[in-house]
Amino acid sequence: MQLLVYGYGNPGRQDDGLGIELVNKLEDWAAENGLDNIEFENNYQLNIEDAEAISNKDLVIFADASKEDIEDFYLSKIDGSGKLSFTTHAASPAYVLELCKELFQKEPLVLLLHIKGYEWEFKEEISPGAQKNLDRAVEYLKPILEDPSLPLGSPGQFKSC
């Protein structure tokens, strides 16, 4: 099974860099554990080119910082929107998935990991509270990445706060 973990955000805006930091931590862990079926990417934002990057994967986990009212993190399944309209400079995970389906006739399982952030100033450091949330999210994802055959769509598999 081919996996992609893709973090996005701005590491120069404190907790907005949570997705990128998640990728850094998991990439080191995967290398130490010989997990060579996982690809890691990060960027400031998702782009239309990412539709190709996900087209040859079975499972894609996008990770981003969140201002949502959640405890620490939340993993949700992304469905294609059913329509293509590109009106901003950045693409959403649903848009990237829909574009992948349209252009490559592929539909990987796509999840979005929302990691709770608190500080958004122009600094290159993650706040202590967000760091705890990040550490919890990393530990939650490790067994999923080790055994992606886990029933990801079943109740109880997704972390909800």
Predicted regions, residues:
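N-terminal catalytic or cofactor-binding beta/alpha core of small enzyme domains
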Residues: 1-115, 124-136, 141-149, 158-161
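Acidic/polar active-site rim loop that often engages polyanionic ligands
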Residues: 118
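Glycine-rich phosphate/diphosphate-binding loops and the adjacent beta-loop-alpha structural elements
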Residues: 121
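A cross-taxon signal for low-complexity, glycine/charged-rich
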Residues: 153-155
